[in-house]
Design a protein with these regions (language model features):
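Sec-dependent N-terminal signal peptides
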Residues: 4-14
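Acidic/polar low-complexity interaction segments
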Residues: 155, 190, 194-196, 216-333, ...
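Segments that shape or occlude catalytic/ligand-binding pockets
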Residues: 27-231, 342-370, 580-586
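Active-site neighborhood of glycoside hydrolase catalytic domains
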Residues: 399
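Cleavable N-terminal signal peptides
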Residues: 12-13, 24, 432
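Zinc-dependent metallohydrolase catalytic domains
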Residues: 313-316, 320-396, 404-586
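Second-shell loop/turn segments in exported
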Residues: 46-53, 104-107, 137-148, 180, ...
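Sec-dependent signal peptide cleavage junction
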Residues: 8, 17-36
Length: 586
């Protein structure tokens, strides 16, 4: 296909003559007119094609490849590069339309973390496209190279870099070649690796991403499990059923807590709530090192049990109580079943550890928690005498990460950009505050970790981040040379927007009307469930949240949302911009 530029706003694929005023007017009167209603960064809405007689998957793929005659699209959402294709990865029916999620490929390799959402109505008309296409891949010099490292060379380099013992035998090794965007913005071929090695003393497993041309490891994580207590590690929980009585315990704040538990066929009680979806399970990780080092049990560890319905483990009791409230919030307020709307099992490990974050080597001093997307679980350390596990907002923050992974169908081991990572952190903080307000009512606040006894994780209203450092809240700060684009530091660029909206504050001279927590949270959830993609960036999320506000509450509300984004350095959203009109060459 050839291109010929008609104007700054329209581009044609093939041959297309400029339309006269009369022709435009005639089209507007045509009920079958193909037209764009919304064209904003990462989002196009309207009647974007004529009815198509094909499978929904083919309709979506042809649109993204610029092959649907007469279609309207944004330039950032289509490509004519012959080596680019799109692979359907998920299909759902939503609001009487078929919603498809498609992963972009180049020369049959997935572009890492790059996907789009296309909605097709019953007549084969595309109504919504969300996300962006990676452009100009043919111009990337590293993607013309075909002399990749061999599989044996990859394995050899991996063993050397990760310092795998020479006597360790490979028991698992899988790889997927992808097109990967490096920090410098250039694309290269890389391989995403999952591995397990084992000798008489240890089992070593993890993930890595390696440049297939240079052998550079672009990302790595490894986990080492000692075998000295192998008989303990092999113990499995008996068959469980819901216990008749509730579980009791005290959290790290010495508060009495109640929660559902299970009873095993061995007569013991277990920290497993079988009443919520496919269950909430709390494990003892026994200070396994999450990034390599000594470990007795590994993750998730051993399912926590007790001879009575009372559980003495204060960290476990605190997390179980919090998880119950968090699950209920998402189901009752957003009809979200578990973190992925598939009612997946919720797994959390207490007594976690990361040797890289504890300077004194005392495992009980690990003051952190995390969601691990590859393991599909959360991990909590014992730091601050266990108070971390009792902090509802901290627990909800980690569950918020799971929600981001689950709603965007994101199973990648590393987020594709610093923007995606920052948004993920900011939204996790947002869910932390929302659940605290849901449970504690008027005692909720926008301070992450306010119950930790002097250690504030992030104070969103005062723009204070980790360690008392500045929390960036303006999008333009993200691009400053002095900003290393660390995700937690930049999380305020979205969380402070949502704070302003919920509370009705004036920021940088721009006032917005108070929307309240319930309204803002429903808008954010709609954006995540209907528009957000795995490679979400700041300007795309702005488009998606503003559109979600319009979907639910109309133009007046969406205008307030847009004002809040502008107060934080985001550009004003044009209703229609960068439109492409497609016509197949003959």
């Amino acid at each position: 296909m050839n291109y010929r530029k008609l104007s700054s706003a329209f581009v044609t694929f093939g041959l297309l003559c400029p339309l006269s005023t009369e022709a435009i007017h005639a089209q507007e009167l045509d009920k079958n007119e193909v037209k764009v209603e919304i064209a904003q960064p990462g989002l196009t809405i309207g009647k974007l094609t004529q009815p198509q007689n094909d499978t929904k998957e083919n309709i979506a793929k042809k649109y993204l490849k610029g092959e649907v005659n007469g279609a309207k699209a944004q330039q950032e959402q289509v490509t004519s590069e012959k080596n680019v294709d799109f692979q359907p990865t998920n299909k759902e029916t939503k609001e009487n339309q078929t919603e498809l999620r498609l992963a972009q490929t180049y020369k049959n390799y997935k572009v890492y973390g790059q996907d789009l959402i296309v909605k097709v109505d019953k007549n084969g008309v595309i109504t919504t496209v969300s996300g962006k296409v990676a452009q100009n891949l043919d111009q990337q010099p590293n993607l013309t190279i075909t002399n990749f490292l061999s599989k044996n060379e990859v394995k050899s380099k991996l063993r050397n870099i990760l310092q795998i013992p020479s006597d360790a035998t490979e028991t698992e090794f899988s790889s997927e070649t992808v097109v990967y965007k490096k920090k410098d913005g250039h694309y290269t071929y890389a391989t995403v690796l999952t591995f397990t090695y084992e000798n008489n003393e240890q089992v070593i497993n993890g993930n890595a991403i390696m440049d297939l041309q240079t052998g550079e490891v672009l990302f790595q994580e490894k986990f080492i499990k000692n075998k000295e207590n192998k008989t303990i590690n092999q113990v499995t929980a008996p068959k469980l059923s819901p216990a008749k009585e509730p579980g009791t315990g005290k959290n790290a704040l010495q508060e009495n807590v109640l929660f559902n538990i299970a009873k095993g066929t061995d007569g013991k009680f277990y920290l497993a709530d079988l009443s919520r979806g496919n269950g909430i399970y709390i494990y003892n990780a026994d200070y396994a090192d999450s990034l390599g080092g000594d470990s007795q049990a590994g993750y998730p560890g051993t399912l926590i049990s007790s001879n009575t319905s009372n559980f003495a483990d204060k960290e476990a009791a605190g997390v179980m109580k919090n998880m119950s409230n968090i699950y209920d919030y998402f189901k009752k307020e957003h009809n979200l079943k578990s973190y992925d709307n598939k009612d997946s099992k919720v797994v959390a490990s207490v007594h976690g550890f990361d040797s890289t974050e504890v300077s004194d080597g005392v495992k009980e001093n690990y003051v952190n928690a995390f969601w691990h997307p590859s393991w599909n679980q959360m991990v909590f350390g014992d730091g601050l005498n266990g108070k971390l596990t009792s902090a509802l907002d901290v627990t909800a923050h980690e569950f918020g990460h799971a929600v981001f992974s689950g709603t965007t169908k994101n199973k990648i081991v590393r987020y594709p950009s610093a923007e995606t990572s920052a948004l993920n952190e900011g939204l996790a903080d947002f869910w932390g505050t929302q659940i605290e307000y849901y449970v504690k009512k008027d005692k909720g606040n926008w301070i992450m970790g306010d119950t930790l006894g002097g250690l504030t994780i992030r104070d969103i209203p005062r723009e204070i981040g980790d360690g008392g450092n500045k929390l960036y809240t303006n999008l333009q700060d993200f691009y400053n040379d002095g900003n290393d684009q660390e995700s937690h530091v930049n999380s305020g660029i979205i969380s402070h927007v949502l704070y302003q909206l919920a509370e009705g504050k004036t920021y940088n001279g721009i006032a917005v009307q108070k929307q309240g927590n319930e309204k803002v949270s429903k808008v954010v959830m709609r954006a995540l469930q209907n528009y957000a993609t795995s490679a979400e960036d700041f300007e795309s999320l702005q488009s998606h949240i503003v559109q979600a506000a319009k979907d639910l509450y109309g133009n007046t509300t969406s205008t307030e949302f847009e004002k809040a984004f502008q107060a934080h350095g985001y550009k004003a959203l044009a209703k229609i911009s960068k439109v492409v009109e497609v016509q197949q060459g003959k």
